[in-house]
Amino acid sequence: MLSPFEQFLRRATAGGIVLIAATILTLILSNSTWHTAYHAFWEQHLSLRWGNWIFDQSLHHWINDGLMAVFFFVVGLELKREFLVGELSSLRDAALPVIAALGGMLAPALIYHQFNPTGPAADGWGIPMATDIAFAIGILVLLAWRIPRNLIIFLTALAIADDLGAVLVIAIFYTPALHIKALMIAALLLLALLLFNRSGVRHTLPYLLVGLPFWYFVILSGIHATVAGIFLAFTIPARGRILPDELADNLSAHGQHLRDTITHSKRLNPLVNGQLAGIIQDIRNLSVAALAPQQRLEHAIQPWVTFAVLPVFALANAGINFAHISVNMLFSSVTIGTCLGLVLGKFLGIGLSSWLAVRLKIARLPAGVRWRHLLGAAWLGGIGFTMSLFIGQLAFGDPRLREEAKLGILLASLIAASIGLLWLFQVSRKKGDVPA
């Protein structure tokens, strides 16, 4: 049976492949004879009505405000798991990836700011701060047999810490005017969710029933809906209703009951043997009760996010018409600032902050990981894609600036992935580099 981390790696790798395929399809559609219909499709409106109440959004907004809230909900579940029992659960283990993530966010923002110090373009400083976990881990796993396993764990923890930083940036710097009444209602709903957690509610339905209006009022408050996904995830209980030892005792008793029923019954089909079906259902309910709601939801939703939400997001946001790319667009301050911020900023920020943390004995390199491995991971940190595209949509209202940022993100992701892959392939050929 695969460990949770191995399951995560498998999903991330497959998800990266699907995301690449969706991006290629998007670029094909954007540069085909269907490009007008392609763009018009995402501007179609979808409305929800109930009496006099109406909630009307374009498909593009439903994806960015709705589906991406589900993505951030899963990110929140992953963050909570990492803080409780994962690589970020202890200061000693979390120090290096967290410091590396901070450096990897500050340096790209500073580089972008050097090219765009004033004007509307200056609002895009948050675009190169993000790392796409699916792409970066997917590339790294291609070399899993040549590199230390702890390098994959390091980059995963870094990307998760990076996601948290991106969420904070969105919440603090990309939130327009706040609507206090809606914010107060959202706060009351969040309080109700926290009370569910503290009072031992382990069924997921109450969290869903309160979580949906919470998401709606967060949107009305002016805060981006993705923040609602993170907060909702943090309220989901991380403990099951029964403990493992209690589960073992109950399973032992039910197992004996099941054996006795099988021995004394001629009908062994649960469809026609109600007693047998009842015992099996009790065993199933006990097993579910032992799993934390957080685990159940993450296991159930993450495949949908990996193979549906993110590819649909790419289809709606990654399209760029190459015929519209001019020399001015290619060398615009937004394109260059975004591209250099991701490629050089991530490499320098992650590399230098990690070196400084180890040098000052604040952190240590993971077992089996050498500096040349870590620098390879730093190059891969420049794959910004999903989160960078998302922040670009929030940062710019001007379609021209959005297109320039999109071009910079695509170029940077391609360059960073190529350099990182070649770098790690080359340095892993050195003797003594046996995966740990």
Swiss-Prot record:
The cellular location(s) given in this protein's UniProt record come to: Cell inner membrane
Q: Which keywords does this chain's UniProt record carry?
A: Antiport, Cell inner membrane, Cell membrane, Ion transport, Membrane, Sodium, Sodium transport, Transmembrane, Transmembrane helix, Transport
Catalytic activity reads:
Na(+)(in) + 2 H(+)(out) = Na(+)(out) + 2 H(+)(in)
One of the protein's GO biological processes: regulation of pH
Q: Which Pfam families match?
A: Na_H_antiport_1 (PF06965)
Where primarily located? membrane
User: What GO cellular component is one of the record's annotations?
Assistant: plasma membrane
Gene3D superfamilies to which the protein is assigned, alphabetical? Na+/H+ antiporter like domain
- Record keyword Cell membrane present: yes
Any one GO MF term held by the record is: sodium:proton antiporter activity
Domain of life the protein comes from = Bacteria
Kindly list the residue ranges recorded as spanning the membrane.
14-34, 59-79, 95-115, 125-145, 152-172, 176-196, 214-234, 300-320, 336-356, 374-394, 407-427
Its record classes its membrane topology as: Multi-pass membrane protein
Function, as annotated, reads: Na(+)/H(+) antiporter that extrudes sodium in exchange for external protons.
Which HAMAP family does the record match to this protein? Answer: NhaA
> Which family would the database say this protein is a member of?
Belongs to the NhaA Na(+)/H(+) (TC 2.A.33) antiporter family.
Q: What is the name of the protein in this document?
A: Na(+)/H(+) antiporter NhaA
What organism is the protein native to? Acidithiobacillus ferrooxidans (strain ATCC 23270 / DSM 14882 / CIP 104768 / NCIMB 8455) (Ferrobacillus ferrooxidans (strain ATCC 23270))
Give the source lineage, highest ranks first.
Answer: Bacteria, Pseudomonadati, Pseudomonadota, Acidithiobacillia, Acidithiobacillales
Q: Which gene encodes it?
A: nhaA
